[in-house]
Curated annotation (Swiss-Prot):
This is tRNA-specific 2-thiouridylase MnmA. It catalyses: S-sulfanyl-L-cysteinyl-[protein] + uridine(34) in tRNA + AH2 + ATP = 2-thiouridine(34) in tRNA + L-cysteinyl-[protein] + A + AMP + diphosphate + H(+). The gene is mnmA. Belongs to the MnmA/TRMU family. The record marks H133, Q350 as: Interaction with tRNA. It comes from the Bacteria. Gene3D superfamilies: Adenine nucleotide alpha hydrolases-like domains, HUPs, Translation factors. It comes from Shewanella sp. (strain MR-7). It is an enzyme of class 2 (transferase). ATP binds at G16, M17, S18, G19, G20, V21, D22, S23, M42, G132. It is found in: Cytoplasm. CDD domains: MnmA_TRMU-like. Catalyzes the 2-thiolation of uridine at the wobble position (U34) of tRNA, leading to the formation of s(2)U34.
Length: 372
């Protein structure tokens, strides 16, 4: 690994330390570049059982151990109230409305790059903040700053960060975005950081790993109903539409049906008026396919957005292959998007994120699908 010449002596960076390997290596790399680095550990959820408490305590312990190893300060802050008001209530409202939200995107918008940045500015006098996200920033000669996909295609997290403003991107550093994941772990191991082999976190942003059905049921009353085929035959019962999403294959409890072929069953629609879960066989069932979508709540990182008719691509979920598409603006806050080829399992409530090459342009929320 080539050494990095220090070029940023004196600039203060507050790194969001999660207790994971990505933030650990981010702090180390920034120190190598000459920044004055301090860590900040966020507590964003009030744990309500012992397992959660232990996991959160372990993350803080690991973050402290890494900061001790690197010789930097670790601050802590509690954003639980902000998380509840700005992320979790939105999450519940979307599920209640029958949509499938992405809390990680809202969490980045409201907590990691807003509440965190404000705290780093007002309390810790930071020049920049830094996170362990796999994205890159590019500073252009004209003074603009763009957000790019991470070098590691499999770990690229730009989909989750499309709501960042130009100003937020300009104040943020993403050291691991220039690296592959295996390189990050190798650096952590070489530096003797205890997080080098720590498993990547999954689950809902800050709420951690838990049984989703049980967790959601604590906050929203489930409404059981029928499962029907696309042809209208009742073949089972569901415990609540909110527990299911378009394209879902597992957990339907309808295997081994008589008079059906061997193709697996998928959720192809949710009938909110009748509280019916509609299923069909095969991952390309006609009810599962869309020719396009209407997208609203638009946000463009550079404030301008793509030009109508330009050759760009879209992702309608994380780690999806790029989808070539054509855009038409219906108004300042609504897009009509037509796919070059039909796409399966496009889900209202999820985010559509647009790219021009490696540049993440921004996106919006999928509102309605175009079928037929």
């Amino acid at each position: 690994m080539t050494s990095i010449e220090p070029t940023h002596t004196g600039k203060k960076v507050i790194v969001g330390m999660s207790g994971g390997v990505d933030s650990s290596v981010s702090a180390y790399l920034l120190m190598q570049q000459g920044y004055q680095v301090e860590g900040l550990f966020m507590k964003n959820w009030e744990e309500d059982d012992n397992d959660e408490y232990c996991a959160a305590a372990e993350d803080l312990k690991d973050a402290q151990a890494v900061c001790d190893k690197l010789g930097i300060k670790l601050h802590t802050v509690n954003f639980a109230a902000e998380y509840w008001d700005n992320v979790f209530e939105y999450f519940l409202a979307e599920y209640k409305a029958g949509r499938t939200p992405n809390p990680d995107i809202m969490c980045n918008k409201e907590i990691k790059f807003k509440a965190f940045l404000d705290f780093a500015d007002d309390i810790l006098d930071a020049d920049y903040i830094a996170m362990g996200h796999y994205v890159r920033r590019r500073d252009n000669a004209d003074g603009t700053t763009q957000m790019l996909r991470g070098v590691d295609n499999n770990k690229d997290q730009s989909y989750f960060l499309y709501t960042l403003s130009h100003e937020q991107v300009a104040r943020s550093l993403f050291p691991v975005g220039e690296l592959e994941k295996h390189e990050v772990r190798e650096i952590a191991k070489k530096m003797g950081l205890i997080t080098h082999d720590k498993k990547d976190s999954t689950g809902i942003c800050f709420i951690g790993e838990r049984k989703f059905t049980e967790f959601l049921g604590n906050y929203l009353p489930a409404q059981p109903g029928n499962i029907e085929t696309a042809e209208g035959e009742v073949i089972g019962k569901h415990q609540g539409l909110m527990y299911h999403t378009l394209g879902q294959r597992k957990g339907l409890g309808i295997g081994g049906m008589k008079n059906s072929n061997d193709d697996p069953w998928y959720v192809v629609d949710k009938d909110l008026k009748r509280n019916v879960l509609v299923v069909g066989q095969g991952g390309h069932h006609p009810r599962l396919m869309s020719n396009g979508m209407f997208v609203n709540q638009l946000h463009w990182v550079d404030r301008k957005g793509p030009v109508e008719g330009s050759q760009i691509v879209v992702k309608t979920r994380y780690r999806q292959q790029d989808i070539p598409c054509t855009l038409t603006y219906l108004d300042d806050n609504t897009l009509k998007v037509v796919f070059d080829e039909p796409v399966a399992a496009v889900t209202p409530g999820q985010s559509a994120v647009f790219y021009d090459g490696d540049v993440c342009l921004g996106g919006g929320i999928i509102d309605q699908l175009i079928r037929g």
